[in-house]
Amino acid sequence: MLLRSFRTVELLRRISTSSVSGYRTSPSLLQRCNGFQSYLPHRVTTTESPFPSHISRFCSSQSANSQNENRHTTLSSPVSSRRVNNRKISRRRKAGKSLSISPAADAVDLALDSVVKIFTVSTSPSYFLPWQNKSQRESMGSGFVISGRKIITNAHVVADHSFVLVRKHGSSIKHRAEVQAVGHECDLAILVVDSEVFWEGMNALELGDIPFLQEAVAVVGYPQGGDNISVTKGVVSRVEPTQYVHGATQLMAIQIDAAINPGNSGGPAIMGNKVAGVAFQNLSGAENIGYIIPTPVIKHFINGVEECGKYIGFCSMGVSCQPMENGELRSGFQMSSEMTGVLVSKINPLSDAHKILKKDDVLLAFDGVPIANDGTVPFRNRERITFDHLVSMKKPDETALVKVLREGKEHEFSITLRPLQPLVPVHQFDQLPSYYIFAGFVFVPLTQPYLHEYGEDWYNTSPRTLCHRALKDLPKKAGQQLVIVSQVLMDDINTGYERLAELQVNKVNGVEVNNLRHLCQLIENCNTEKLRIDLDDESRVIVLNYQSAKIATSLILKRHRIASAISSDLLIEQNLETELASCSAV
């Protein structure tokens, strides 16, 4: 697919994210943007909080999908017995114009008992020192109540959270909130509050439809510049798949000309008496150009959580496609003058499409919808969007019917769609990094957050080989990780090996390494006198006396005040395997 492919991991990670905590800009995309780098999307973050200035602030921000609004039900039941007044607001939807006289006034009436202010304390891990966390940060954002006593906000508002409080309008009391579910790809989260006092007088907002162009919306929230609720109004100017900066994702978004500022994140955009979307990011360097997450994406997220009990992600077909706008290109693949489509150039080995499609197939239609030569499909009122939107609208494990031209003959195949993960994770919020230390060698799985530790210009300053593999390589089997030597903690046992850092681990005692857990098992279960580790396409080798290395590991950990040689996630898995083995032996 053009935008939802595994190559999106590269393309979408390169968006300007100078205001985003943990994300860095890649200049190669800025060069392709023909001078428009100052107008790239930024995650609208939470406001600067009134905490001491020395405390670092939380700043909010590719491979992804969108969804089908016709499959989802609206969430309309109120939290309390108080009812939201249903106002009769007429609209000429066919013309795409709003006749609502005062959308801001209507939004205020709805928001007073629905929109809340969110206070978050968060702590991010250090990827260079994975056994440590960075300093604590405080931030603020917005959210609103939906049916079922739930609060919707942005994922970046509560990312890496350690403590969350909410406060409703007109109250001085903050209530403890728990994060029930987070979808970082779609930048959405669900909070729950146990306090009965909090829910007194609160009303649930109802999710509406995608607004048409030029329809009026009002964004409600708690942006910087004050402590009370704020309402800004504007009109819809564009509806199309957009870069979701926080999740490095491509999903449908709505562009509006209402001011969306830090602190607005998670607040509702209200159209009439329903929610049209959730405010989440804006364009740096541009005035009053903001983006809201549309209701189909919100409903997909909520429905997935309700059905599966957790966030399930957005589907991908797992293909990378080339536009076929050139006539000679179409002729070369035996396309008739009436045919349109896109050319399959790469296929993710872990996708269902890998077993069905072939390189140089031409995708003609998806679920009966013709695909144009530029990869777009029709979308209401003569608008067009990329066909990735249709793919991401599917539920996990749902099938799609694709029409394919192969060697001049048309075929139809049924393909199962599911969320796909890249070989190198694009983000790792709300979890501690994995690591394993042996003989002073710090082994970690390569992630893009690790590369971001190299600074703002990480695309150029991080190790070139690792950066290339992070953006280009595809997983060949499930559970595969790219394991590297992050650094070498100096000791007599590793003298002479101190420069063998930032290299990939390929083999341990001749066995190819699948992931960090596998490497840990290979080393811990070594039964030979010598331990051999092959690095970087077997061009570098480490040989250690195994028993001496085990003794040295304990001394190195004590010297560097490291509590454990193995991260908690690997330790838990290792203990479980030991318990299972003991049970089997009994």
UniProtKB/Swiss-Prot annotation:
Annotated localization: Mitochondrion matrix
Active site: 156 (charge relay system), 187 (charge relay system), 265 (charge relay system)
Boundaries of the annotated transit peptide in chain numbering: 1-22
Primary location: mitochondrion
Region listing for Serine protease, in residue ranges: 117-302
Segments forming domain PDZ: 318-398
Region (Disordered): 60-96
Disulfide bridges in this chain: none
Top-level EC class: hydrolase
Origin superkingdom: Eukaryota
Biased composition (Basic residues): 84-96
Gene Ontology biological process terms in this record: proteolysis
EC number: 3.4.21.-
Gene3D superfamilies named among the record's database cross-references: 2.30.42.10, 3.20.190.20, Trypsin-like serine proteases (2.40.10.10)
InterPro entries on file: DEGP_PDZ, DEGP_PDZ_sf, PDZ, PDZ_sf, Peptidase_S1_PA, Peptidase_S1_PA_chymotrypsin, Peptidase_S1C
GO cellular component: mitochondrial matrix
GO molecular function, one term: serine-type endopeptidase activity
Listed Pfam families: PDZ_2, PDZ_3, Trypsin_2
UniProt keyword annotations, A-Z: Hydrolase, Mitochondrion, Protease, Serine protease, Transit peptide
Stated family: Belongs to the peptidase S1C family.
Function, in words: Probable serine protease.
Name by which UniProt lists this protein: Protease Do-like 10, mitochondrial
Organism: Arabidopsis thaliana (Mouse-ear cress)
Lineage, opening ranks: Eukaryota, Viridiplantae, Streptophyta, Embryophyta, Tracheophyta
Name of encoding gene: DEGP10
